[in-house]
Amino acid sequence: MEYQSPLHKKLHDGVFVFTAETTPPDSSNKETLLKKIKSLKGVADAINVTDSPGAKVHMSALTAAIILAQNDIDPILQLTVRDRNRLALQGDLVGASALGVHNILCLSGDDPKVGDQPETKPAQDIDSTTLVATANMMRTDKKFPSGRAIDPAPKLFIGGAEVPSKGKPNTEKILGKIKNGIDFFQTQYVFEAKKLEEYMKVLNDAGILEKTSFLIGLGPFASAKSAKWMNDNLFGVDVPDEIIKRLEQAKDQKEESKKVCFELIQIFREIKGVKGIHLMGHKKEEVIAEIIKESKIS
C-alpha cells in the first residue's frame, strides 16, 4: 500500500495519534513560525495550519505548511473554499503535494463579515464537499475536473470536520462524505465522555468506523471565563458545568485545565473508534506539547 503521508501510515498501522494546531503568524519571517511551533516538533504526529481563521489575514496557510514540511514536520493544510475559486484550489493541491504537503483538511472557512475586513467578498465558487470530491478525483483518477491528465498525480490524505456535540450523528451524511473521498475526520471540541461514547457507538453500528479515522477535538482553557466564552460563542461546543466549577475552584486554573485535558484523553482513547486526539487552542502550542508528552508516557 502506498501511504499518502506519515499521518496516513501511522493511522493505518494503528498508532494512536496526536495532532495539534497553529495559526500562521502576522509576519513574513519564517523563523517566527518555526519558533512558534518549536515545542510541538517531534511531539505532535502532525500539525494543522489554519487558513486565516476568524476571517483575519495571516501568513498564507499553504506557505506555512510548506515551511513545516521543509523542517521535517508533517503538516495538515487547512484549505478553505472561502477565498479561492476552483482553479486556485486545484493549483494549490498540486503545488502542496509537490512540496511535501500531503494532508489536507477541507473546510468552508469563516464568513468574512466576522473578520477585520468585513467588506471582503468571498469566492463562493465551490463548497467544501466539492473540494473533497475534486481532491479525490485528482489523486485517484489522476486528472483535473476538466479531464486533463496530471502526471504525476498529487499524493493527498483528505480530511473533513465533524461536530459530535450537536446530537446524534447523521450517518448517511458521514458515509456520503467518506464515499466522496474523505479519509479522516477531525472534530470540534468534545468535553463530555458519555456523549462521545454514544456518538461513536452510532458510528460503529453504521459501519463507519471501519472505513475512516476519527481524531477527537480537545484543548486547554485559559480560565473558567474562557470556558464559558467557548460555550456561548463556538458552534457545537458544550463545556459541562462540572468542568467550569472545577476550574473556578482551582488555585491555578491553567494548570487545572491541563489536568482536565489529560484525564479526558485517557478516557477518550479507550472509546471504540477513537484513533487519536486533535488538540487546539489559540497561542497554546507549548501547553499542548506538554499535554501530548504527558499523555504519550502514561
Place the predicted regions along the sequence by residue.
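N-terminal amphipathic alpha-helix/helix-capping segment at the start of soluble metabolic enzymes
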Residues: M1-T23, S27, K35, K143-K155
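Active-site-adjacent beta->alpha loops and helix N-cap segments on the catalytic face
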Residues: S5-H8, N29-E31, A55-I67, N85-G91, ...
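Active-site mouth loops of central-metabolism enzymes
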Residues: V17-E31, P75-L87, K155-P169, L247-K259
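Conserved, mostly hydrophobic/aromatic
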Residues: E21, I47, A96, K177, ...
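Short, acidic/polar
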Residues: S27-L40, S60-A61, R86-L93, K166-I178, ...
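Active-site cofactor/substrate anionic-group-binding motifs, chiefly glycine-
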Residues: V43-D83
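Catalytic beta/alpha-barrel core
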Residues: I47-V57, L79-T80, C106, D183-A193, ...
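Active-site pocket-lining/capping segments in soluble small-molecule metabolic enzymes
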Residues: P122-D151, A161-K166, A206-L264, K283, ...
